[in-house]
A protein has these predicted regions:
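A short small-residue
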Residues: 115-125
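Flexible, glycine-rich phosphate/dinucleotide-binding loops
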Residues: 13-15, 89, 121
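N-terminal beta1-alpha1-beta2 submodule of the flavodoxin-like/Rossmannoid cofactor-binding fold
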Residues: 1-70, 125-199
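Short, glycine-/small-residue-rich phosphate/pyrophosphate-handling segment
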Residues: 70-115, 130-133
């Protein structure tokens, strides 16, 4: 079977930053590189997602910038889903924001991987039959699409860069760079930083 890890961001001490910060959130961000997929779960707060989800957008931004600079998307071949609790109007907007962000980072969103639950809080969500059915759909589809992506490995043939940032410059010395370079070289992708390596 598949394994998953639940990370509760409110229990972590972390900085809300667009920089590569070494704090309690950093190891979990690094784990995304080794995972087959990720789910963002958030309640609706005044029609929007939580501040913790916004912090994830910000903290993953350096990876997005690195991907543009190096013409390599490290999150290709990985799947993405969302869970929004609290019900009512607004969940479509939250899914949309999350999916827009995820696809720009290279994630694939399988069908039926958007969960809406009127229940709030883990204790209530696990008792809600409708929510549990959506969770089953999401889990099966994410697992299936992750397997298909891993076996097909579209990363090697896909286009990795849509923006020419060569004239923009910017910081690219991130702590995750070496790991991503190794992955890129493994699929035969030549990035700016690994261009001198034998790929």
């Amino acid at each position: 079977g598949d394994e998953c890890e639940i990370v509760t961001m409110r229990d972590l001490k972390y900085d809300a930053s667009t920089k590569d910060v070494d704090d309690e959130l950093k190891p979990h961000i690094m784990d995304i590189f080794k995972s087959d997929g990720i789910v963002f779960a958030t309640p609706i707060w005044w029609g929007g997602h939580s501040s913790h989800i916004q912090s994830m957008f910000q903290r993953l931004d350096p990876i997005y910038s690195w991907g543009k600079d190096n013409k390599f998307q490290p999150f290709y071949n990985k799947v993405f889903g969302t869970l929004v609790s609290g019900g009512g109007d607004g969940f479509q907007h939250i899914h949309g924001n999350c999916y827009n962000f995820a696809t720009n980072l290279g994630f694939t969103v399988p069908p039926s991987c958007n969960i809406e639950s009127k229940a709030q809080g883990m204790d209530e969500i696990v008792k809600d039959e409708q929510t549990l059915e959506q969770v089953k759909n999401c889990a099966i589809n994410m697992s299936t699409w992750a397997r298909v992506l891993k076996e097909g490995n579209p990363t090697k043939d896909a286009r990795h860069g849509t923006v020419d940032v060569s004239s923009v410059g910017g910081e690219t010395d991130y702590a995750f760079s070496d790991d991503v370079q190794e992955e890129a070289a493994g699929v035969g992708i030549v990035t700016k930083q690994n261009a001198t390596k034998d790929v």
